[in-house]
Regions:
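Flexible helix-coil transition and linker loops at the boundaries of alpha-helical arrays
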Residues: 1-2, 27-54, 85-87
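Structural signature of alpha-solenoid helical repeat junctions
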Residues: 3, 20, 49-56, 73-76, ...
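TPR repeat positional signature
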Residues: 5-8, 61, 96, 127, ...
């Protein structure tokens, strides 16, 4: 069974289309859900990732949420991310990153601020989305230091968001902090948020000043 799930994970990773990826994750979820009842989840609430046999199901649910986000099904994606954050309080699947983008896209600034307080970290997603929030809510001057901090963590994001660097046809399977692959994944998930709030002109101007 685990071998079959691994094959489905591989097929999901190879799929360029988020709808096709979603189908593979749904297969894993439907298969794995049969192994765990409500009592199991209640017994491990907040620490689900600590149970190794539950990790494939949790990872598949996180993958499903990412696909829903890419497909614009934001309500369903939000519900799944929040359920996973309740199940894994330490957020081992890193749902906080795409969830921060979802909140920014929707303009749910209070929710984003609460997420930033809960996870006080210098990660690409949280810093760039914090800069976007500051730009929208407080203006260019207030957002400038937040953007500088984000660029310090990953300098490749502005060029990727602005289309100066071509995006890959499918999401990177692996990435390291500060890498071009991380920037590509952030841009694939988050560009709509920046477009929605008309922030790309400011980003182009501000990133240019940072580079000069």
């Amino acid at each position: 069974q685990t071998r079959q799930w691994q094959q489905w994970f591989e097929l999901a990773a190879e799929s360029r289309d988020p709808l096709a990826r979603l189908g593979w994750f749904e297969r894993i979820i439907a298969d794995a859900n049969l192994l765990f009842d409500e009592a199991f989840w209640q017994a491990h609430a907040g620490h689900g990732w600590q149970v190794p046999e539950a990790r494939p199901l949790i990872a598949a649910r996180a993958g499903r949420a990412d696909c829903l986000l890419r497909l614009g099904q934001l309500g369903q994606a939000r519900d799944e991310y929040l359920a996973l954050l309740a199940l894994c309080r330490a957020d081992e699947p890193a749902c906080r990153h795409p969830l921060s983008t979802l909140y920014a896209w929707q303009g749910e600034w209070d929710a984003l601020q609460q997420l930033l307080v809960r996870f006080d970290e210098a990660s690409c997603w949280l810093l760039y989305n914090k800069a976007l929030m500051s730009f929208v809510c407080e203006g260019e001057a207030a957002a400038r230091p937040h953007l500088a901090a984000a660029i310090g963590v990953n300098p490749h994001v502005p060029a990727t968001l602005l289309g100066q660097r071509r995006l890959p046809k499918q999401e990177p399977r692996r990435w390291q902090g500060g890498s071009r692959d991380e920037a590509a994944l952030y841009a694939l998930q988050s560009r709509e948020a920046w477009l929605t709030h008309n922030a790309l002109i400011w980003l182009r101007k501000s990133a240019g000043k940072q580079a000069s």
